[in-house]
Amino acid sequence: MDARHIMTVAAAALLLSCGSGADEAARAVDALPPIYPDYAGVTVPCNIAPLNFKIRGAERIRAEFVAGGEARFVADGRKGAIEIPPKKWRALLADADVAEVRVSAWSAAEPEGVRYAPFRIIVSPEPIDERIAYRLIEPGYEGWLQMGIYQRDLTNFDEDVLVDNSVNSTGCVNCHSFRDYSPDEMLFHARGKSGGTVFVRDGRMKKVDLASTPPLRQGVYPMWNPRGRYVAFSTNDTAQSFFGGHGQPVEVYDQSSDLMIYDTETGRMLTDERFFSDARWETFPAWSPDGATLYFCSAEPRSMPLDRESVRYDLLRAEFDFATGALGERVDTLYDSRTAGGSVSFPRVSPDGRYLMYTRADYGTFPVWHAEADLAVMDLCDGSEVDASALNSDEAESCHAWSSSGRWVVFASRREDGRYTRLYLASVSPDGEFGKPFLLPQRNPDQNAWRLKSYNVPEFVRGEVRLPRGELKALFK
């Protein structure tokens, strides 16, 4: 098991009647505890925040954490929730001499208590990147009150705002990208009054109005080349329509889209007539880890929104010349929607360059509203499809990212309720096998349910991002 440590969780419910002092549940059942979030059988990094959980409807639960056959600590929780002591949790995960780790829990479900069957948590020796960044926004259609880009420390529960729309008079703040997981080099868009694209490099910030740079088109979906200097953008004319008597009430779609490459050293926007014309719609650029190949999605134009269900995006790639900023003559089609069916969006290549993860829906370019949208993975060595079924659900899976080690992925999913996108983490083995996804840990397990905002565009970052807020505000005066 690659020197992983196996944590087995034995959970039992204990509902105390008035005046009862019993600590041992009276009845044992051969069933896993109905904990929320579901952490049974997941593989977690050795530096992850505590996996606090609850049993809904319980008044008290008690969890015993056992490692190597001996009890390490016990955590008691009122109102049905367990808050694991962080120091004890870290010590448990760091115990490299333990071949097997078992966790036992007693939860409150009946007056006399119930002891549940144990469940396992597998602890990987592979750490996860310290931070993730994401946007939080109400899942509305046209309007919003507040949105922002945030960072979360995955080793604890700290969350900080990087930038929100108070800096640009409540305009849209979106589409962040980091250069090669660096907390010191990033960009984001801020629309509205005095808007522009903000580039951050080593503590210095610069706002650029891409729409005033020939060819006078605004950048939308970005990805910074891992080697620096260049940023690939798609420029999208996006709209949405609402439909009655249809299983899907709204469709977000492009009416045109092209590719552009911005040279951060010269301030020039580079275009290629093959990918900047009315002949095709190109979107979602993504670089290979060495920065020498650009992947992107491409579709034949249709009359929108009437022909929305016939729009299907292929997955293409082209070589990139870093010296000139030009794309090569050869263009490969990796996924042909005419023969394979479906529509591709959000391509992302693993750090070792072997795998490419993408989102596949029946049609279109905005899978967030498509319940059938799933994550798919391609082996770039031979073009075969890798089994990613462990990651998917009956609701929409959408944007995603690889960790810098390639051993973890984060992705957005609506599996909880079909309305809000929340973030899930999953392990990746060296041979491309995905572990059971688990919900982003929170100090209070209910936070995942009562936070009425959607997460999108999760990105791993190697360390803390520091943006001087005063300087940010000054950019938009």
Model-predicted segments: where are they?
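Bacterial N-terminal signal peptides that target proteins for export
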Residues: 1-7
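Bacterial N-terminal signal peptides
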Residues: 8-17
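Sequence signature of WD/YWTD-type beta-propeller architectures
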Residues: 18-477
